[in-house]
């Protein structure tokens, strides 16, 4: 039993500078995978006033027009006017791309285990590292409630902006939600909501506060979670006209907690965007979420965290760890046994299991990689439920 407590998570909109960088990196990755599914991509992006810098290591047979992809991505986000200090037409795009290091490539091309002649041992992990996956029964999508609500708020802001319902909104925005949990660890109410949204110069704070409460908060936060004690901070600085890459420089991979579980679960430190699936930072994090979600969906635990760890150039994970936080009747060793039996966690196994050589990544680069109900992502499927139950019944 725990004490009543508060927990807070945040999200950012697609127009946040770090998210602009993530989307550019993943748009380039998708364009390359469309033509060359076997490409090795590690694409980083930095954005600032009037400038996008694309750099990293890419080995591919494909040609893609990086300038064109960058400009279109920036425009799609909503940076279409020079007065924003950053727009798709006039922004300078610098490209500095190298090939993947041959020292890394040799470990990925032929894993340590390849001598055993199993073709799934052909691909070694692209780096060492540890990755976490998590699921909890607080929401239908099996995500922690604070991050789920935070994502809903900024997605709603983008929707109202793009549909011109609130035409004064600009692309950059952030949200933060504090949830109160009872002594059983169950969410009871929303304690605090913070929303900061970029806006046109002429719009008053009073207008913004009214619109955000009526058309954003009341539309996406369940009414039973709000009460007279809920606190609201809407544009608490009073003004947010200068924003996006003009207000702050942005960089790929700087919003890894927004991308995952909002701090509710641990994180191994590796970012996702701009990386192809031989990079276990990305693919093994997706696999760990897939495992965790299926365990909770099967009713085997109410809350579970899965850790995977890899060595560079080695196909098999060096460790698998599962923590059910006392919410399962099963020993964690039994769950690990069932996971090993039903999930191939070698990089090639994950790539095949989740079909990760497809251009599916740009859509994940804003509003979270997990718990998405608006798009169809393979690691969000619960198609291993029966197999897990069957393994544990043996």
From Swiss-Prot:
The Swiss-Prot or TrEMBL record lists the needed cofactor(s) as: Mg(2+); K(+)
Q: Where does ATP bind?
A: 16, 172-174, 239-240, 248, 254-255, 271, 275
The cofactor note from the UniProt entry for this protein is: Binds 2 divalent ions per subunit.
- Pathway noted in the entry: Amino-acid biosynthesis; S-adenosyl-L-methionine biosynthesis; S-adenosyl-L-methionine from L-methionine: step 1/1
Which reactions appear under catalytic activity for this entry? L-methionine + ATP + H2O = S-adenosyl-L-methionine + phosphate + diphosphate
Q: Which Pfam families match?
A: S-AdoMet_synt_C (PF02773), S-AdoMet_synt_M (PF02772), S-AdoMet_synt_N (PF00438)
**Residues involved in K(+) binding:** 44
Q: What does the record give under GO molecular function?
A: ATP binding; magnesium ion binding; methionine adenosyltransferase activity
Please give the subunit comment from the record.
Homotetramer; dimer of dimers.
Name the job this protein performs. Answer: Catalyzes the formation of S-adenosylmethionine (AdoMet) from methionine and ATP. The overall synthetic reaction is composed of two sequential steps, AdoMet formation and the subsequent tripolyphosphate hydrolysis which occurs prior to release of AdoMet from the enzyme.
Protein name in the entry: S-adenosylmethionine synthase
Biological source species: Enterococcus faecalis (strain ATCC 700802 / V583)
Taxonomic lineage from the root:
Bacteria, Bacillati, Bacillota, Bacilli, Lactobacillales
């Amino acid at each position: 039993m725990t004490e009543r407590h508060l927990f807070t998570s945040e999200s950012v909109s697609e127009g946040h500078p770090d998210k602009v960088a993530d989307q550019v990196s993943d748009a380039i990755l998708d364009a390359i995978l469309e033509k060359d599914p076997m490409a090795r991509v590690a694409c980083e992006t930095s954005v600032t006033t009037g400038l996008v810098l694309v750099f990293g290591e890419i080995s591919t047979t494909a040609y893609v027009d990086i300038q064109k992809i960058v400009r279109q991505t920036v425009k799609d986000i909503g940076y279409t006017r020079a007065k924003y200090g950053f727009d798709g037409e006039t922004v300078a795009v610098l490209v500095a791309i190298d090939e993947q290091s041959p020292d890394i490539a040799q470990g990925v091309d032929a894993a340590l285990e390849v001598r055993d002649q199993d073709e799934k041992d052909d691909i070694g992990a692209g780096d060492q590292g540890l990755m976490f996956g998590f699921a909890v029964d607080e929401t239908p999508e099996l995500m922690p409630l604070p991050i789920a609500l935070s994502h809903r708020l900024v997605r709603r802001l983008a929707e109202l902006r793009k549909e011109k319902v609130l035409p004064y909104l600009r692309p950059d925005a952030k949200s933060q939600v504090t949830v109160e949990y009872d002594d059983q660890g169950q969410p009871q109410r929303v304690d605090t909501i913070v929303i900061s949204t970029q806006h046109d110069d002429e719009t008053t704070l009073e207008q913004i506060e009214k619109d955000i409460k009526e058309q954003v908060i009341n539309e996406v936060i369940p009414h039973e979670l709000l009460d007279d004690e809920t606190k609201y901070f809407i544009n608490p600085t009073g003004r947010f006209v200068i924003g996006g890459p003009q207000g702050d420089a942005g960089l790929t991979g700087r919003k890894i907690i927004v991308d995952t579980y909002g701090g509710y679960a641990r994180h191994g430190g590796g970012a996702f965007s701009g990386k192809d699936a031989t990079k276990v930072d990305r693919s093994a994090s997706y696999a760990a979420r897939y495992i965790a979600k299926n365990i909770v969906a099967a009713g085997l635990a109410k809350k579970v965290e899965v850790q995977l760890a890899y060595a560079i150039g080695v196909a098999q994970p060096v460790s698998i760890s599962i923590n059910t936080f006392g919410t399962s009747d099963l020993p964690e060793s039994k769950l690990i046994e069932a996971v090993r039996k039903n999930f191939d966690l070698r990089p090639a196994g994950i790539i095949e299991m989740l079909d990760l050589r497809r251009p599916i990544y740009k859509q994940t680069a804003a509003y979270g990689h997990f718990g998405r109900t608006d798009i169809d992502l393979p690691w969000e499927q619960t198609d291993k439920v029966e197999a897990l139950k069957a393994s544990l019944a043996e």
